[in-house]
């Protein structure tokens, strides 16, 4: 079966190289003319979507989710709570080794709006420190708990701030079928989907969503990859809800 992940990888490498070499140019159809009068068929880019998960890690559910994503060759983005990382270092390292993007979701899931700079750093900077101790230095993007951040927080963020465009509120009733239906009815190219990897129902929903959208031709990427693929240069302190 065609691997959409590999299609995306090679499409991003092949097409710019051909354009740079003058061997193909954009055209109205799938075939672009070459300098020799022939043509090179350039496949259309598939629709892209980013699955994101908050509030973990949690041993049982996050492990099962990682297993399911690996089986499907899917990358996702995990926003971790700092005080839940201790004792889960092996799980967090596995996330990184599997190619997932890892970000910050505060230290203890407190709202990070209306904080002093010192308290903000205890929530965000402290969590980055925990992640760096486990993974080494890295760009750990921020997702504020409850999606709430004030202007001061944006100035202090030290990274892009990631929200979402599709929220099935999976925490409310933990109804897998409803969550899947909600996501499938709202998703589109460039969507950022919010789920939580601490519920068994959400893990079930995520894998069903992955299968359904893969069947529709979607390709799953991290948030950073999504913005890059859409030509968006992420900026520190800027909020991103989708890639359009």
Regions flagged by a language model, labelled:
Residues 36-44, 71-73, 85-86, 201-244:
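C-terminal domain-boundary segment and adjacent tail
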């Amino acid at each position: 079966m065609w691997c959409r992940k590999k299609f995306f990888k090679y499409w991003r490498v092949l097409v710019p190289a051909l354009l740079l070499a003058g061997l193909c140019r954009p055209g109205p159809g799938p075939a672009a003319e070459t300098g020799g009068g022939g043509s090179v068929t350039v496949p259309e880019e598939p629709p892209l979507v980013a699955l994101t998960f908050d509030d973990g890690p949690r041993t049982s559910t996050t492990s099962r989710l990682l297993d399911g994503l690996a089986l499907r060759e899917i990358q996702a983005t995990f926003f971790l709570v700092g005080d839940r990382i201790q004792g889960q270092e092996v799980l967090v390292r596995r996330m990184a080794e599997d190619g997932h993007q890892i970000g910050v979701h505060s230290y203890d899931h407190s709202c990070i709006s209306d904080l002093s700079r010192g308290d903000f750093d205890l929530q965000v900077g402290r969590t980055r420190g925990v992640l760096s101790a486990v993974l080494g230095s890295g760009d750990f993007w921020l997702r504020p708990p409850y999606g709430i951040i004030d202007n001061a927080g944006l100035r202090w963020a030290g990274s892009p701030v990631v929200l979402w465009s599709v929220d099935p509120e999976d925490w409310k009733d933990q109804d897998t079928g409803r969550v899947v239906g909600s996501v499938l009815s709202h998703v589109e190219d460039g969507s950022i989907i919010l789920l939580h990897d601490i519920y068994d129902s959400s893990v079930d929903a995520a894998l069903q969503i992955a299968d359904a959208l893969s069947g529709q031709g979607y390709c799953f990427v991290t948030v950073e990859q999504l913005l890059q693929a859409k030509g968006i240069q992420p900026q520190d302190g800027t909020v991103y809800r989708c890639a359009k």
